[in-house]
UniProtKB/Swiss-Prot annotation:
UniProt EC number: 2.1.1.177
Described function: Specifically methylates the pseudouridine at position 1915 (m3Psi1915) in 23S rRNA.
Description of how the protein assembles with itself and partners: Homodimer.
Subcellular location: Cytoplasm
Phylogenetic placement of the source organism: Bacteria, Pseudomonadati, Pseudomonadota, Gammaproteobacteria, Alteromonadales
One GO term describing the cellular component: cytoplasm
Provenance organism: Colwellia psychrerythraea (strain 34H / ATCC BAA-681)
The protein's name in its UniProt record: Ribosomal RNA large subunit methyltransferase H
Stored HAMAP family: 23SrRNA_methyltr_H
Length: 156
């Protein structure tokens, strides 16, 4: 199974790329974790945000291979503890489909992405910086995998 994080925005600081790479390389071959960056629409003083959001959503959905389970990252989504996320990861693996995790831009995700979503996941009720979210998702999923495989990374 493949886990892929589809994220709006492509000009991240080096520490973001390094942090994401550190966790993604730890996953085993049979559970790869990758990042696909979607360019953010140009925002300015008089930008049409709804049009930009729709275009970003269009690009996100076009990048996802058919048959993937779509999981959107949203404040209103389900909040999972590490054990619950581990169970969720296990269910995804049993399902056999690849998983596409979607993170929107500054204004969030387009309505089309939310509509296409099979599950909604909330990392926190807090508003988090998008660069940080990439690393948090990678670490959380790696930790969930370590729980499922009794790897010593996670300690109770």
């Amino acid at each position: 199974m493949k886990l892929t994080l589809y994220a709006v925005g492509s000009k991240m600081p080096a520490w973001v790329s390094q942090g994401f790479a550190e966790y993604s390389r730890r996953f085993p071959r049979d559970l790869s974790f990758n990042l696909v960056e979607i360019p953010a629409g140009k925002r300015g003083k008089n930008a049409d945000i709804s049009r930009i959001l729709a275009k970003e959503g269009e690009l996100l959905l076009a990048a996802i291979p058919k048959g993937n389970r779509i999981v959107t990252l949203e404040v209103e989504g389900q909040s999972w503890t590490t054990p619950k996320l581990a169970k969720q990861l296990e269910q995804w693996q049993l399902d056999g489909r690849d998983v596409a995790l979607l993170v929107g831009g500054p204004e969030g995700l387009a309505p089309a992405c939310i509509k296409a979503s099979e599950q909604k996941w909330s990392l926190s009720a807090l508003t988090l910086p998008h660069p940080m979210v990439r690393i948090l998702i990678a670490e959380s999923l790696y930790r969930a995998w370590s729980v499922n495989t009794n790897h010593p990374y996670h300690r109770e």
